[in-house]
Amino acid sequence: MAEKSKILIIGGTGYIGKFVVEASAKAGHPTFVLVRESTVSDPAKGKIVESFNNSGVTILYGDLYDHESLVKAIKQVDVVISTVGQMQLADQTKIIAAIKEAGNIKRFFPSEFGMDVDKVNAVEPAKSTFAIKVQIRRAIEAEGIPYTYVSSNCFAGYFLPTLVQPGATDPPRDKVIISGDGNAKAVFNEEHDIGTYTIKAVDDPRTLNKTLYIKPPKNTLSFNELVAIWEKLIGKTLEKIYIPEEQILKDIATSPIPINIILAINHSTFVKGDQTNFVIEPSFGVEASELYPDVKYTTVEEYLSHFA
């Protein structure tokens, strides 16, 4: 069997980054994480770095904004996975420049882990947020860097514990607010599964220069179907309040940052159905649960059962 690629994760202490690092180490890849020295002294992040150390991950000190340290780190690996957060998406041009200079990278995974930004029809301000990811994609392609874009749609941990109810900390037990008519389908993926599928794609020729869509059939659901699963789990029918699209668009226009961004992303997802309103063609994409049927992914029903 071929040797497993050495992987560098940039942004590994972030929300989805932790799961990617864990999956990489678990799969037996020599795993490296780029961290700033200041990160280690941060109480919460320091604990994460410590857990990486304990699982055999190599910590490399460096910074997205320090070109030398970036090139030095990249030269030690075969694959770079970026999981940087929203504020640093545009600065991934610095990673692209370092990859070009290093000249040894077999594949780059930019920070995606959401909707396929080439397929969305979002309104502002989500439109501008997605546009940054589009610019990074085009920059990677223009430089001829081999890539995989991971479209993992909705993080279960963001959406399912509250069933996307505004301002809620628990799932609804009496009434539920539904965007639009509740028929547009979205996809909900548990974060460990996102990490697992991402790492499986690293050395897979089938995912090279393609988008890897994580769209398991049991987790591809309309909001009405999602509510029906929850109702079954709690043995109760909820009162349903449907918010028409024109009201949602008004709310987006009048809400402050970051509420307006969240509302606009939810509009794209749950009203427009931007995660599911296209067919995955072999020319540009592959679907994770089809490629890796051995992965026992967490279903939405299993996930929600912990809250029932």
Swiss-Prot record:
GTP-binding among keywords: no
Keywords: NADP, Nucleotide-binding, Oxidoreductase, Phenylpropanoid metabolism
One example GO MF annotation: nucleotide binding
Expression induction: Triggered by EOBI in flowers.
Record-linked Gene3D superfamilies: NAD(P)-binding Rossmann-like Domain, UDP-galactose 4-epimerase, domain 1
Pathway participation: Aromatic compound metabolism; phenylpropanoid biosynthesis
Tissue expr: In flowers, mostly expressed in limbs, and, to a lower extent, in tubes.
GO terms, biological process: phenylpropanoid biosynthetic process
Required for activity (site feature) positions: I265
Ligand binding (NADP(+)): 13-16, 35-45, 86-88, 111-113, 133, 153-155
Coiled coil: none
Pfam families associated with the record: NmrA
Domain of life, per lineage: Eukaryota
Site (Confers substrate specificity): Q86, L89
SUPFAM superfamilies referenced in this protein's UniProt entry, alphabetically: NAD(P)-binding Rossmann-fold domains
EC number: 1.1.1.318
Active site feature: K133 (proton donor/acceptor)
InterPro entries on file: NAD(P)-bd_dom_sf, NmrA-like, NmrA-type/Isoflavone_red_sf, PCBER-like
Catalytic activity: eugenol + a carboxylate + NADP(+) = a coniferyl ester + NADPH; eugenol + acetate + NADP(+) = (E)-coniferyl acetate + NADPH
Keyword NADP: yes
Family membership: Belongs to the NmrA-type oxidoreductase family.
Function: Involved in the biosynthesis of the floral volatile eugenol. Catalyzes the synthesis of the phenylpropene eugenol from coniferyl acetate. Phenylpropenes are produced by plants as defense compounds with antimicrobial and antianimal properties, or as floral attractants of pollinators.
PANTHER family (alphabetical): ISOFLAVONE REDUCTASE HOMOLOG P3-RELATED, PINORESINOL REDUCTASE-RELATED
Protein name per the record: Eugenol synthase 1
Source organism: Petunia hybrida (Petunia)
Lineage: Eukaryota, Viridiplantae, Streptophyta, Embryophyta, Tracheophyta
